């Protein structure tokens, strides 16, 4: 069965890895999609690179699937400015891709939780490199993949799931929740999590995503190009903003007294305004306005994984692409056309 799209099956790990191990032993290169300057997807190219050697505490993973996050698009373009942290003029890392799923191929000294042949997944935000046949990841970033999920499904959860879980934890039964950017990966998880807690959920995204947001549970939907979600007839108890672009005062007026606004991504100006004056405006008006400081690691995405395994939360894969098709995959996410998550796998 296809390792990207098929369900996990019982298989002898050495057999699964035989060809790659031979390749590693010979010292041949492996495929990776790399870039050396910020820009459009056109700057990406496939290159043969040396097989990475795991350092102490690291794991080498044979990649089966890597999902695309908006952070990959931002790191490709070097915009917003915070995407250049660690690499002001040139990319800090040549290969993008943090949400990986695959098979342990080798381990560095000190690794105790995994061994070759284990199926793993996680958010490798520190090292990235998931858009390749092999990548390195810290042991602490990975968890064992549930047998009930395919590699593709598992790769969709770590970053998007952690954001959605932490961004909706204040939702309660009967509360009014708004999610801006609700038609993407984090947003589609967030809608389902808030609905599971009994909230009335409004999803905001472009016109092409209205039906999709309803299909994952949104009670109301807003096309941001037609309507201003910060001037509701009934204000919200919780707002999760995945693409912040408005003023702090606009967010304040959309909240009930005692309400909460948290943003994760968006324009630099909007984020700086929230950081600089959000807490002050919030205190003066009886609201909580701030940036969501997302906690990383398996402990913070495992709750969503558990719900996906039981079927309480559904995973929505919009499309799958090969490594060679990565430019198209990134453009689909970056241009706001993906419904849920986009996944990239080996050729």
Task: Locate predicted features.
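Glycine-rich phosphate-binding loop and adjacent beta-alpha segment
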Residues: 245-313, 346-347
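C-terminal hydrophobic helical "lid"/dimerization subdomain
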Residues: 21-28, 297-347
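Mid-domain Rossmann-like dinucleotide-binding core that forms the NAD(H)/NADP(H) cofactor-binding site
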Residues: 155-223
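A structural motif shared across PLP-dependent enzymes of the aminotransferase-like
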Residues: 126-139
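A glycine-/small-residue-rich N-terminal strand-loop-strand element
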Residues: 76, 100-126
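A short acidic, Gly/Pro-enriched loop at the edge of an enzyme's catalytic core
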Residues: 231-238
């Amino acid at each position: 069965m296809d390792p990207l799209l098929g369900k996990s099956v019982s298989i002898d790990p050495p057999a699964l890895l035989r060809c790659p191990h031979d390749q590693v032993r010979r010292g041949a290169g492996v495929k990776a999609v790399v870039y050396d300057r910020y820009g459009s997807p056109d700057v990406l190219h496939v290159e043969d690179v040396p097989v990475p050697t795991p350092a102490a505490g690291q794991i080498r993973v044979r990649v089966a699937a890597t999902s695309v996050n908006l952070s990959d698009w931002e790191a490709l373009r070097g915009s917003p400015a915070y995407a250049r942290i660690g690499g002001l003029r040139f990319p800090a890392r040549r290969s993008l891709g943090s949400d990986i799923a695959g098979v342990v191929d080798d381990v560095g000294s000190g690794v105790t939780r995994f061994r070759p042949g284990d199926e793993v997944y996680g958010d490798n935000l520190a090292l990235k490199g998931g858009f390749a046949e092999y990548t390195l990841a810290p042991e602490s970033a990975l968890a064992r993949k549930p047998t009930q999920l395919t590699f593709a499904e598992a790769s969709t959860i770590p970053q998007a799931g952690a954001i959605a879980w932490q961004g909706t934890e204040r939702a309660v039964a009967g509360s009014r929740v708004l999610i801006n950017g609700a038609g993407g990966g984090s947003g589609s998880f967030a809608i389902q999590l808030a609905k599971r807690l009994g909230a009335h959920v409004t999803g905001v995204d472009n016109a092409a995503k209205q039906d999709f947001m309803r299909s994952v549970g949104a009670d109301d939907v807003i096309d941001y190009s037609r309507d201003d979600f910060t001037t509701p007839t009934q204000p919200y108890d919780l707002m999760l903003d995945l693409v912040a672009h408005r003023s702090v005062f606009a967010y304040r007026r959309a909240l009930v007294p005692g309400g909460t606004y948290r943003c994760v991504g968006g324009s630099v100006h909007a984020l700086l305004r929230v950081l600089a004056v959000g807490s002050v405006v919030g205190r003066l008006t009886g609201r909580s306005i701030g940036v969501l400081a997302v906690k990383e690691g398996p402990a913070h995405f495992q709750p969503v994984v558990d719900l996906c395994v039981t079927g309480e939360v559904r995973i929505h894969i919009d499309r799958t692409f090969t490594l060679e098709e990565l430019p198209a995959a990134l453009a689909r996410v970056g241009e706001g056309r993906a419904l849920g998550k986009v996944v990239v796998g080996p050729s």
